[in-house]
Regions:
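Double-stranded RNA-binding/processing signature
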Residues: 1-239
């Protein structure tokens, strides 16, 4: 049976700002489904049920905070909330908390550090940790964690308009600075119909600024726009 000494979690708990009464809740929050495929005798479930709970807790607490503290229209608050709870933001917070080395994954998943899948694994683990804190310490403990690690970055998001999606931001900036409206072209399609991969270029007039890929044209356009923001230094990093 695979076991983890409870004392090993002390540095992580200090970074999280929460000490678990039941360390098993923390272990489960850090356990990816793939780990159980290689460790059938592992005594804990994977983290997907905790993720399900944590997602709901996170959305409620963020929504309540925005409602109570800002009189902006519903549409704006929705965009702000999305910027706070999306996978990229949560994965960035997970990286800052340095708990990637604590994640329990299959050997294959553990090696694949730079993939989009890893970003979602990290984001889902944050939600699972929120769920585990909620069960272990109650709503107040979960709210404290969310305020400390997630809502604390709201001023940065608002200042840098990170709630605007990359396509909109790239277009607005290009029009403001250059007087040009970007256009997108599919440069490549690959893969079978059920698993297509699109490569899209974003152009300013005839200049190819950047490319992006995704499983849909829309996803590839968003990736290209983000790459364009980075290439033009019109983007601000969360790190």
């Amino acid at each position: 049976m695979t076991t983890i000494p409870q004392s090993d979690f002390k540095p992580l708990e200090e970074r999280l700002g929460y000490k678990f009464k039941d360390k098993g809740m923390l272990v489960q929050a850090l356990t990816h489904r793939s780990y159980l495929n290689e460790h059938s005798d592992f005594p804990y479930e994977h983290n997907e049920r905790l993720e399900f709970l944590g997602d709901a807790v996170l959305e409620l607490i963020v929504t309540e905070y925005l409602y109570k503290n800002y009189a902006n229209p519903e549409g704006e608050l929705t965009n702000w909330r999305a910027a706070l709870v999306n996978a990229k933001t949560l994965a960035g917070i997970a990286t800052q908390l340095a708990f990637e080395d604590y994640l329990l994954m299959s050997k294959g998943e553990a090696k694949d550090k730079e993939s989009k899948a890893r970003m979602y694994i990290l984001a889902n683990a944050i939600e699972a940790i929120i769920g585990s804190i909620y069960l272990d310490g109650g709503a107040g403990a979960a709210e404290s964690f969310i305020h400390k690690h997630i809502l604390s970055i709201l001023p940065f998001i608002l200042k840098n308009q990170l709630y605007i999606d990359p396509k909109s931001k790239f277009q607005e900036t290009a029009q403001e600075l250059l007087g040009i409206t970007p256009n997108y072209k599919v440069l490549k399609e690959s893969g079978p119909d059920h698993n297509k991969e699109f490569t899209v270029g974003v152009f300013l007039d005839k200049e190819l600024v950047a490319v992006g890929s995704g499983t849909s044209k829309q996803e590839a356009q968003i990736a290209a726009a983000q790459a364009g923001l980075d290439a033009k230094h019109w983007s601000v990093s969360m790190s």
